[in-house]
């Protein structure tokens, strides 16, 4: 279970689960400024610096922050390097997923819990593509307003679906123009770990009901960290943050649901009308040259996510 969550909690970009979108955007911004980036997100830095989510996430934009952390704690620095590399690899993986989907003729996209995802703006979508973004109303409003005020326009027909995924989001999606008879490419990135196990099953059940043959779904699975190890890392990060002077406004780990009976996403999809495959995130990081050898828990497969892709039979 999660100690900071309730069944009806809500958030904006500066609180609770909303702040995790800022964290991920900060990692994308850092990767974008690398000499040979895996991904390019020209809007990530803007979305971070205007969020007001706290100095911790903005500090991640500092190119010298890793060296400062390393001077205090090498293991925490390795984790920071890993987190940045992981987010770059994850983004690259799902960017490729969408490129493959539109190459196959799919023109209807749904990004679940989209947060500060800027794919509707930064990817080169074919004419006639509609991108639906589902998230909390205040999160969607912050992103669209910030980008519009800075002259950024979508590269597809972007439609906001301001609804909590614990509510009747299929009805809200249809009301926004979604056509359940058309093939769709769905994405659940950075989402499943913030859902209880039964809500994860329900989410994929509803996706299946809205997906004709040839539709696709991609997901990042929820990692499973041992409680003792999680607490050790929490204490180390707090010590480093205190030394550097960062205020920790939220404990991301406490926002996640740890359910030992959570279904394996690949197995569940294969048993419910999909053809699913997965690449373990550590394999993807090695393949793309972003693996950090001394990262904590490197020998624990369950501590890292899978990237799953499936097609509706």
UniProtKB/Swiss-Prot annotation:
Keywords: Methyltransferase, S-adenosyl-L-methionine, Transferase. GO terms for molecular function: methyltransferase activity. InterPro entries: Ppm1/Ppm2/Tcmp (IPR007213), SAM-dependent_MTases_sf (IPR029063), SAM_mthyl_Trfase_ML2640-like (IPR011610). Signal peptide: none annotated. GO terms for biological process: methylation. S-adenosyl-L-methionine binds at residues 135, 164-165. It holds the Pfam family LCM. Its EC number is 2.1.1.-. Exhibits S-adenosyl-L-methionine-dependent methyltransferase activity. Belongs to the UPF0677 family. This is Putative S-adenosyl-L-methionine-dependent methyltransferase MAP_3564. It comes from Mycolicibacterium paratuberculosis (strain ATCC BAA-968 / K-10) (Mycobacterium paratuberculosis). The lineage of its organism: Bacteria, Bacillati, Actinomycetota, Actinomycetes, Mycobacteriales.
């Amino acid at each position: 279970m999660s100690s900071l969550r309730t069944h009806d909690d809500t958030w904006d970009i500066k609180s609770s689960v909303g702040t995790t979108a800022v964290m991920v955007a900060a990692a994308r911004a850092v990767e974008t400024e690398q000499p040979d980036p895996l991904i390019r997100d020209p809007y990530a830095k803007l979305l971070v610096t205007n969020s007001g989510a706290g100095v911790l996430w903005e500090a991640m934009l500092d190119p010298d922050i890793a060296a400062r952390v390393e001077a205090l704690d090498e293991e925490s620095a390795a984790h920071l390097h890993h987190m940045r590399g992981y987010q770059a690899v994850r983004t690259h993986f799902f960017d490729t997923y969408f490129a493959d989907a539109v190459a196959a003729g799919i023109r209807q996209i749904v990004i679940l819990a989209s947060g500060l995802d800027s794919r509707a703006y930064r990817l080169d979508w074919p004419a006639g593509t509609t991108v639906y973004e589902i998230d909390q109303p205040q999160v969607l409003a912050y992103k669209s307003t910030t980008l519009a005020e800075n002259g950024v326009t979508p590269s597809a027909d972007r439609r906001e679906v301001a609804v909590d995924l614990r509510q009747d989001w299929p009805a809200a999606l249809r009301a926004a123009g979604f056509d359940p008879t058309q093939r769709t490419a769905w994405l659940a990135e950075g989402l499943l770990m913030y859902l209880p196990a039964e809500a994860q099953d329900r989410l994929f059940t509803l996706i299946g009901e809205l997906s004709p043959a040839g539709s696709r779904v991609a997901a990042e699975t929820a990692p499973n960290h041992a409680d003792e190890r999680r607490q050790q890392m929490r204490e180390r990060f707090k010590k480093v943050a205190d030394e550097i002077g960062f205020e920790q406004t939220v404990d991301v780990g406490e926002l996640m649901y740890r359910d030992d009976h959570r279904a394996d996403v690949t197995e569940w999809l294969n048993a419910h009308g999909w053809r699913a495959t997965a690449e373990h995130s550590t394999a993807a990081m090695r393949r793309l040259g972003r693996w950090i050898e001394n990262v904590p828990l490197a020998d624990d497969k369950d501590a890292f996510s899978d990237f799953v892709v499936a097609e509706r039979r």
